[in-house]
A protein has these predicted regions:
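Long, compositionally biased charged/polar stretches
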Residues: 1-615
Length: 615
């Protein structure tokens, strides 16, 4: 009994407010009270009301919302609700929402303390969490885009996605406007150059966008140099391919009379472009004629382009994050501490992935139009790559050890990935230890075990044989698994995404397609190179897509800088504060190192790492 102060926060994005009236109920452990005053939410505003409650409520458990509409349902984006009372000395309660409120049903928001099933011995939240998961499983259904690939969210269009998974209006408008700009520029360039000759490497300058990236301009000027060619495999757009070789690859076949080259392999780089069913091709050497050696390197870079975009970027970044997202929404209620920890790192993933499936890798999409592996090859490559989705490969300490890159001083990706992993692991451990006091508490959490099994057995199609756990037995194992999930959705995706504009804008450095077969002789000329590299339209489309995906987004949220507060209480806030402190220290260290480098490596700079797979 007494006076309660209630503050309601509405989102700041376009259309977040509502013309509909909203009624509230306070639900306590001992009673429930309807708030007579109705509010009309205003975009970007906090609305405060006071209510004199006659009933004794006890500690508050829920706030219930009911949005009334007469003619039109006007959706409302609610950030949170704060309640203080009874009286000026009463307790404060925070009820996170961060979702759209639509329709005429009643929405119940639990108080923001993270609670496992074991934290609710009286079962006060049991019915709520069961009903929430039941509703979510109807909304979030597994789909199968292509046989043999890890599963995805069911749905063919944006409208098939739950409203809370779609872009907010601000991001949607910017994304679609920038896409339209890129396609318009492509059309203009195509029309202006339709009759011009395309017979010299300098002609690629016609479609190169200056002023977008200093590194891209350096690549344009220096791409023929062997040092830059090799550097890219350590710290370029795709740092996931390189591994230390302790013996010659079995696929490296020496043509008759060239066996003596084996002893020279330790001294200089050599390339071989094998063709299935054909006799061994020649080994291409830096001492070959310039155009011969350049063409061989272009083939290697084009192959890396395919592996990067499909395996490292799409599969290991986007699609893996989608599995984590769908499993989380199906298995963890919003009151669960693991849900609260991971949900900021799943924002926008389902829509950006759906756009990729319907625009980039769909039938007659970008890959089919201009990429070598289009027309079905990209699907086969993804299917084959699925066999390499091992648990260790998603964890940098294990992956870098397996690839022999630990301690390689020139691998800035390795250095930064390890430090970022360790920072995230400490952050995760802080939250885990707040909510799980023993290993037994982890083992007994049925919702947590269901979530882990859903990822490994369902989304990843039974990945136990590749090292993924299908149950979690200890706090350390939970910490490691959660760190893998968050690092995949943040740092790992960033390392595969941010380099596209820098390294792929100059098309000859990373051709999306090669129009002639791999060379079998050493008589290549400039004409051969130009006939093999992408034509004008293909190169223009590559440049346009690279800009669309690679340029910095104005509403980007940096790692750990999300404004949403899903947790209540001082403990989680202190853990997040420590994360931000450690990220700031890493930021300073990377900038200090980069100041001494000819080519700075900033793809894991915390201020540039997106908080989720959102682009």
């Amino acid at each position: 009994m007494g006076l309660y102060r209630i503050r309601v926060s509405t989102g700041s994005s376009l259309c977040a407010g509502s013309n509909n009236q909203v009624q509230l109920w306070l639900v306590g452990q001992h009673g429930e009270a309807a708030i007579r005053t109705r509010l009309r939410p205003t975009r970007g505003q906090e609305t405060e009301i006071k209510a004199d409650v006659q009933e004794y409520l006890g500690p508050l458990l829920f706030v219930k919302l009911h949005k009334r509409h007469f003619f039109q349902d006007d959706a409302w984006f609610c950030n949170w609700i704060w309640v203080q009372g009874p009286g000026p000395s009463g307790d404060e309660f925070r009820f996170p929402c961060y979702r759209w409120v639509e329709g005429s049903g009643i929405l119940s928001l639990p108080e923001g303390t993270g609670r496992t099933l074991g934290d609710d011995p009286q079962g006060l939240f049991k019915q709520h969490r069961e009903q929430e998961l039941k509703d979510r499983r109807r909304l979030y259904r597994w789909g199968n885009w292509k046989d043999g690939l890890i599963l995805n969210m069911a749905g063919a269009t944006i409208s098939d996605l739950p409203i809370d998974e779609r872009f907010l209006e601000d991001k949607k408008i910017y994304f679609e406007a920038s896409l339209a700009k890129g396609l318009a520029d492509l059309a203009i360039k195509d029309s202006l150059n339709v009759l011009t000759c395309w017979n010299d490497l300098d002609d690629f300058n016609r479609i190169f966008w200056c002023g977008q990236s200093k590194l891209a301009e350096k690549v344009r000027d220096s791409w023929k140099e062997d040092a830059l060619f090799g550097y890219q495999f350590l710290n370029g757009a795709n740092p996931m391919l390189l591994r230390r070789s302790k013996q010659l690859p079995a696929r490296l076949v020496f043509p008759p009379g060239m066996e003596e080259l084996k002893v020279q392999l330790e001294k200089e780089l050599q390339l071989q472009l094998p063709r299935v069913g054909s006799s061994p091709p020649p080994l291409f050497l830096p001492t070959d004629p310039p155009m011969v050696w350049l063409l061989a390197k272009c083939w290697v870079r084009s192959a890396d382009f395919q592996m990067h975009e499909l395996q490292s970027h799409l599969l290991r970044g986007h699609l893996m994050a989608e599995v984590i997202t769908v499993a989380t929404m199906r298995c963890l209620p919003s009151i669960h501490p693991v849900f609260k920890l991971i949900i900021p790192h799943l924002r926008y993933t389902l829509e950006i992935n759906l756009r990729a499936r319907t625009g980039l890798v769909s039938d007659m999409g970008v890959f089919d139009q201009v990429v070598s592996t289009g027309g079905g090859g990209h699907v086969e490559l993804l299917q084959r790559a699925g066999a390499f989705l091992t648990y260790r490969s998603f964890c940098p300490p294990d992956d870098l050890a397996d690839r022999g890159l630990l301690g390689v001083k020139s691998s800035f990706y390795a250095q930064d990935a390890l430090r970022l992993w360790e920072i995230l692991a400490r952050y995760v451990q802080g939250i885990v230890h707040l909510h799980y006091k023993t290993d037994e508490a982890v083992r007994d959490d049925l919702e947590l075990q269901s979530w882990c099994a859903e990822i490994t057995e369902v989304g990843l199609l039974g990945a136990q044989d590749r090292g993924f756990p299908n149950s979690l037995q200890s706090r350390d194992q939970l910490r490691h698994f959660l760190t893998m999930c968050i690092f995949t959705c943040t740092g790992q995706h960033s390392s595969a995404h941010l380099g596209q504009l820098d390294w792929y804008s100059w098309v000859p450095n990373a051709p999306c397609t090669m129009r002639m077969p791999p060379p079998t002789t050493k008589d290549a000329t400039l004409g051969t190179v130009m006939a093999t590299l992408p034509n004008f339209h293909q190169a223009s489309l590559q440049m346009s897509i690279v800009w669309q995906l690679g340029h910095r987004q104005p509403m980007m949220v940096a790692l750990g800088q999300h404004q949403e507060e899903y947790f209540s209480g001082p403990g989680p806030k202190a853990v997040l504060k420590e994360l931000r402190k450690e990220l700031d220290a890493l930021e300073k260290d990377i900038k200090t190192r980069n100041a001494k480098l000819d080519i700075p490596y900033d793809y894991l700079l915390p201020s540039l790492v997106e908080n989720s797979v959102a682009i």
